[in-house]
Amino acid sequence: MQQPQRRRRNVAPFVIAILVAGSLIVGLRLFIGSRDDGGGGGGKPAKNAETAACEGKGVRLTVAASLEKAELLRKMAADYSGRKVGGQCAEVTVTRSSGALIQALARGWDEGRDGPRPDVWSPASSSWLALLRQRAAASDTASPVSGDNPSVAKTPLVIAMPKPMAEALGWPGKKLGWSDLLELSKSSWAKYGHPEWGAFRLGKTNPNFSTSGLNATIGTYFAATGLSGDLTERNVADPEARKFVQGVEHSIVHYGDTTLTFLSNLQRADDAGTGLSYISAVAVEEKSVWDYNEGNPTGDPTTLGKHPKPKVPLVAIYPKEGTLYSDSPYAVLTTPWVDDAKRAVAADFLTYLQAAPQQKEFTDHAFRSHDGKPGKLITQANGLLPAEPRSTLSPPAPNVLDKVLSSWAELRKPANVLMVIDVSGSMGAQVPDTGKSKLELAKQAAVNALTQFGPHDQVGLWMFSTQRDGDRDYLELAPIATVDDAQRKRLRSRLEGLTPDGGTGLYDTALAAYQHVQGRHSGEAINAVVFLTDGRNEDNDSLSLDGLLAGLRTEQSRESVRMFTIAYGQDADLGVLRKISEVTNAAAYDSREPGSIDQVFTAVVSNF
């Protein structure tokens, strides 16, 4: 395996991809309305019907499933549990797959640390299994997954676009793809008679963190080379291919670890009557288009019908160059704790999932069947085309995939970021079972995050509490500058020197940080503030919350800067931070369990 490099996103892309595996990160919840059930491969499963099906006897199977299908599988598991397999009662528990799952498998699963051990893993895509096998081979260890991993359901990658915009490009009659988006990114919507829509803006997740981002990145390389299969390392290194991919990447508004950020922000814009102003397109799975159009961007069946359908629906563009499927493989682990009895239940549950009634349930939630057949929801009326995709791409070999991720790290849109860290007195509180304070954990997480920035990025650092610089609640520790060796050393030194003192001057600092980045805005970069706090505003002479939000709205009308906030510790004002992030079309992250801060920082930096 490649060793970590001192380059942003060239930091062992396999390591990053393997650790997150396109799933949730243990201890972390992106605070945009998603359901938090405490589940996760390695998290505690929620109590439900299947946990009592065999009254504590028989064979219990734990399935770790990717987010988009976890709730559906949980319901199926509850219906399945109680069956007899090999003369024993079988019960199946479904948890949400997490990044910590693979890390725990790699080091040797510790139930005290990692929670219940999974017996089956069903990520969104087989690509993650290929990466895991590659990692095992590189470290000369046995792979915890075999080579036979049948699909339980499928959904192709599409380019989702507000319907009026897609129709302006010729949808549904005209074949469209990545090359069309590249051309559009070079001009604007004025070329298509809609100057009011402004520049073309693409939403795409980070390929190290998200299946849709990974498949979209692979798809752009195929489009760049004109190939439909057998992508090679040489193809990925081709200068013309790199130029094509870089052109697509530079139309990005920001990246991230989940498409839910884009879809939730788009829903809020639509609610406000500005659904054509946020993004022009976003790379998502086909199922997500239906979920969004039902007013349910989380895709959680329990929230379906609780929000109105959008005024401006999305439609799916199936890239004419070909696309990849998220195939939801079903991988029975080859670890020592998966004995013959569990294997028998795993095989029987797979048969159950692939049977007609369960396949209908998948297709009733806008998945395609395990063999790729569309159900009744895949219709043009729903913005989906059942005859598509006409061309299907196969994931490249793991070594080529590694090259794709490394190349993307060099070609992605650069970042222009200000990190703002709360150093109020409460940050000195000790975090149980760690031997460290909240500030010490946050400093280490921020230092670790620096390794993910590189020489194309610019990063600066502020600290804040109250009256840090005269009457100002904040103090610049390192100006925003190119992340060369000197700046990296400067940032690390300033972070390590932070000490806790004072109150929390949140509102004044937030607006000042936003304006600071606004004044150094780069049209060629993702401009953002990363704002971490463990408290609530305690400066009585500061702006009010309404004043802060009004100021952010005014500034947002100029050049776009996004404020990604982190609610750190139980006393953080999560509701306020959510409002700050929403008004800047970003996202708030929940780290109320301070031990999760390193993982949270990783997720936040995935936006750049």
Model region roles, listed by residue range:
Residues Q430, D457-G497, H516-R520, D541-D546, ...:
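Short beta-strand-loop
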Residues K413-T482, T509-A510, A528-L532, T565-Y568, ...:
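Von Willebrand factor
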Residues R9-A17, G27-A138, S143-S146:
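Early extracytoplasmic/lumenal segment of secretory-pathway proteins
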Residues F222-A316:
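Ligand-binding pocket segment of bilobal, Venus flytrap-like solute-binding proteins
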Residues S146-I159, R242-G256, L304-P336:
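Periplasmic-binding protein-like
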Residues T302-K311, G535-V583, A587-R592, S596-V604:
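VWA/integrin I-like adhesion module and closely mimicked acidic/polar interface patches used
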Residues A137-S210, F222:
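A conserved helix-loop-strand patch within extracytoplasmic ligand-binding domains
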Residues Q2-G39, E55, A331-I421, P432, ...:
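Extracellular/periplasmic juxtamembrane helices and adjacent flexible linkers that interface
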